Amino acid sequence: MADMDRRRISILGSTGSIGVNTLDVVAQLGGRDAFDIVAITGNSNVTLLAEQARTFGARLAVTADDKQYATLKDALAGTGIEVAAGRAALVEAGQRPSDWVMAAIVGTAGLAPTVAAAERGADIALANKECLVSAGELFVKAVADGGGKLIPVDSEHSAIFQSLEDDQRHAVERIVLTASGGPFRTWSREQMANVTADVARAHPNWSMGLKISIGSASMFNKALEMIEAKHLFNVRPDQIEVIVHPQSIIHSMVGYTDGSVLAQLGCPDMRTAIGYALSYPDRPKLDVERLDFAKLARLDFEAPDETRFPALRLARTAMDRGGVQGAVMNAAEETAFNAFLEKRISFLQMADIAEDVMEDMVGYGSAITMDDVFAADAEARRRAAEAIAQKEMAA
């Protein structure tokens, strides 16, 4: 197939869980015969990054880790594949002309390259939460001004996107995000007090990366998704509900003013949402497990406990306050998450750190430009680091 007939795509974060699944979908839908892989990026796993670049014929391979540049360069020697490293190179990957970009870099590091892709008019398949949580209205405007489409990849937001009737947006009454409840759904706070990262990362239904898995256990993942939903679907905070659904079969729902509720169901497999985003508005034929209703037997639901999982309450606080509070909450939680991995604070203290920093930064600045967002992010990380150090001293 000639280059002009292939769809040009880039994958920001190709070595993570979403990136690996995206390339699986690309392979199912024709691989390098159907797709021109303009750029792929990874963090420190340059062995996998080089393998992906070779397999799919990527034009550019970028590692975020400057120290891995030589290793990646050697691994791709003689292939003709361009190699680059560092934060600026990630932004360059987002700027390279392509039709569709998978935004799957975890954390605030994914914000600048995704904005760069949006500003030049690419369709954005959004898996990075921070673009909307931290930059919200600014990011949505960047996509709109660029002229591309914004297609959510999170299973919950993909479900809502698929359940929204375009000509009935005015009739949307509520958005219902489902949550598995994670591995600690039935645990008391006392039981959760001393859990380790290895225990927290064991999600009952989904296969995900470390950050998202532990975020699911603490329900910070769901808290971020609440803020995302507000910006993605232009709804009020009071229209966003969370319901715990342990089986993860109903991925989310939309309630309308006539009492109807539309939902998207499927087996827990990220490739379904990825395939939908890649093929939108069409639906691809994918080799994924089909839902067997006879074997389901039951679907359970329960209200979330915001005492045991305060992240949900913090999300509502951030939405009500507006400004840079989303960026502050996210930055403080990311900093606390890293401290938890390093065994410097406990599982429950992650939410404490986020809440303390949010309270400390009430009224801090405004989100008028991306620089405002980055400044708030940096300040929140600084204050979170101080709070973590204080908890260590008190321990």
Model-predicted regions and their roles:
Residues 1-395:
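Catalytic, metal-anchored helix/loop core of enzyme active sites in primary metabolism
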